[in-house]
Amino acid sequence: MIYDFKAEIIKSKSSSSSKSGAHHWLLQRVTGVVLALCSFWLIYFMFTNKNNDINIIMWEFKKPFNIVILLITVTISLYHSVLGMRVVIEDYINCHKLRNTLIIIVKLFCILTIVAFIVAIFYSE
């Protein structure tokens, strides 16, 4: 039995997995850098408000700059987690139907969490 290496090489080159993999890799790195920058803001915010009352902290959170940074932090962290969970699911789940279902569930969970967070931020007292 002779194994056809040429057919396998052509098959692997014709699939666009390398392009999507590079894009996925780049997205993970970009979201990681954004999260690192946002974590500096979060650490600064925690240290500057460590002795304040909860009402003062909530008032600080309602400033537009802090709301925007907080929304960016939560959204990017959830998107970063979706990217990571997708890699884990694709690597360890062999059944295609289950794999696709789990990826959709993870994406929906993160979308619902982002929407709930936005509603909680803008509709809090």
Swiss-Prot record:
It is found in: Cell inner membrane. Residues 46-67 are periplasmic. GO terms for molecular function: electron transfer activity; heme binding; metal ion binding. GO terms for cellular component: plasma membrane. The heme is bound between the two transmembrane subunits. Keywords: Cell inner membrane, Cell membrane, Electron transport, Heme, Iron, Membrane, Metal-binding, Transmembrane, Transmembrane helix, Transport, Tricarboxylic acid cycle. InterPro entries: SQR/QFR_C/D, Succ_DH_anchor, SuccDH_FuR_B_TM-su. This is Succinate dehydrogenase hydrophobic membrane anchor subunit. It comes from Rickettsia typhi (strain ATCC VR-144 / Wilmington).
